[in-house]
Amino acid sequence: TVTHDQDEALSMASRIAVMNKGDIAQLAEPSDLYEHPANRFVADFIGSVNIFEGKLTVDEPEQAMVDCPELGRVFLNHGVTGAHETTVWVAIRPEKITMLPAGRAKAKDSPSGTNIAQGQIKGMSYLGDVTIYDIRLDSGRSIRVSRPNLSRWDQEEFSWDDKVSLHWHPSSPVVLLS
């Protein structure tokens, strides 16, 4: 079956082919496409994603580090198998980012100074089950964060122009080599 409806494809298919200019960019199970995209095209095509350019500074079997000028230092609890000191892209899904009032975020399971960013809420979209936040990072770059509305009052916790801290687990980002 051919479809352009991502929700339909992800829910019905056991394998999905993502095409780019007539070529298969990736053929995989739906969860693999979403959680482990092969490249920036697939990451951006499937769902919503924040992508930041950086330099791979550490790449060992159990850990990796990417320095992203617009996001900060990103620690991963697994290796990347890329060339050390090369340009890579860090992809992180909006739902994998935790948002707290400014100064309260602490990246668990990560070295100090990694997997954390500061910013200010510049947009909010209440969608019923989730609220989507557009955050302007201190670097000036925007990042999207989604939070489930677990109770009727969750949406009141944050408002426009609030300063916030963001953090993410070291297994959440995906490093893309192309």
Predicted regions and their residues:
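Internal alpha/beta loop-helix hairpins
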Residues: T3-G72, E95
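Non-catalytic connector elements of ABC transporters
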Residues: V49, V58-S178
